[in-house]
Amino acid sequence: MFARWKEWLSLEGKYGKERIRAKYYIINRSAGGAGFFSNYMWVLGHVILAEKLGYIPVVDMENYPTLYSEDTPVGGITNAWNYYFENVGEATLDEAYKSGKYILAPDRPLHKYEEKYCKGDYRFPTPDTVRYYAPVIQRRLRIRKEIEQEFTENWKCQVKGTDGVLGIHVRGTDMKNNLGHPMPADVTEYIERAKRLIATHDEITKVFLATDENNVKEAFEKEFANTRVTLFMNQAFRIWDDGAKKKTGIHETKVANPRPLHKYLMGKEVLQDAWFLHKCDYLLCGHSNISNVAIMWNDNQYKEIQCVEGRS
């Protein structure tokens, strides 16, 4: 009880009191952030607290750059959050700072606000989680219209109205290092589970695969060649699994000759993968923020979700 009271004083108590003088709540992550959807969940938790206390939330990924921040503006934009998303509140970052009436958010994840009703490992969403967060996401964490339109057109190029789509997310790279993440299952387990789902549901005619490893991509291409289903993927930067337990994710991989705007494109590619996953009829996934967010975006419309538990 004392610990909960202490936590309340350091968060709701402290920042509720500051609301007397401050109007804007500036969300930042000073350590440079982590994976794309780790940052997304960080922002989501802080947005919910800001709303609760009556602040206008603003995201600062300009003065607090992330792994996806470029050294030069992207389309004239210098705040990496706005590369991909609309403002989370009714003000720009510049307006918030110039007002002088702002407070910096605590530089930590707000687990009590970003894991509501979740269960098991890695805040896996339940239907109650989705019902709680979907309205906030639709209201505050909106993808830029031109990007969502591009994703929509790309989806329509692959999927027709009668297609039933199984979405599969296989996360590799740093998820295999056992450093705070649930260990993923082997790719053969995903393939076997996918086969069973396809055999059970005749309506599945397409399989969308999202993965950060070329090994996984090739394994699925080999397994589902010349079958009744069509496998498709988005173009994205992927790496080869050399068997080493990587301490960094694909978003931190050093590239010898990076393409122009590589960091920005890394974010856009994982965003499109999650967006495609949320459009699918069925989902097969492990524990990761990407699949968690896809489930919340899907708004309880999946016909079936199967989570492949990893190795202990």
Predicted regions and their residues:
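Short, intrinsically disordered terminal tails adjacent to the first/last structured region
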Residues: 1-2, 269
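Secretory-pathway glycan-assembly enzymes, especially type II membrane glycosyltransferases
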Residues: 3-206, 217
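Gly/Pro- and small hydrophobic-enriched strand-loop and loop-to-helix capping segments
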Residues: 51-63, 285-286, 297-312
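Glycine-rich loops and low-complexity Gly/Arg-rich segments
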Residues: 52, 191-194, 232-236, 308-311
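Cofactor-binding loop segments of dinucleotide-utilizing enzymes, especially the Rossmann-like FAD-
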Residues: 171, 212, 309-310
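Donor-binding and catalytic core of enzymes assembling or modifying cell-surface/extracellular glycoconjugates
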Residues: 205-302, 306
